[in-house]
Amino acid sequence: MAGLQARYTCETLDDIPKQWERFISQVGKVSSRIGEADYGLCIDMSAGGNGFDYVTGVQVSDLANLPAEWVGVRIPAQTYAVFSHSGHVSTLRHIARAIAEEWLPQSGREPAQPSRGEPNLIERYGRQFDPNTGTGDIELWLPIKA
């Protein structure tokens, strides 16, 4: 996976759409792209409220010849709980909170503890996602302990 990375806090979350705009303007330059989905990766989320890194990215076959600002991110093979979302993209943070506060305790599952630099949560935007309406094919992938 490769893409643009920036750090966010609760106060700066509203800047994420600007990162997506930059990403969309550059993704056509990535010749090693695999598939049609776009991804939002939430990385190094801390319970202490220090924010998290967010990567707007795509799957790639290799990390060569990427735009200068882009970084590579390793996505480990592991078990994921996958949640489909049919609402507007702006409600994803509410869905993520419901997963953490309701689904996890009720399911008896535990979130995996990713290594530094690996995602705590993955947003997957499929072919049917329409960035103009903010709706369509959206999934949230939560790494969980097997």
Regions found by a protein language model. Give the residues of each.
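A solvent-exposed interaction/effector surface
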Residues: 1-146
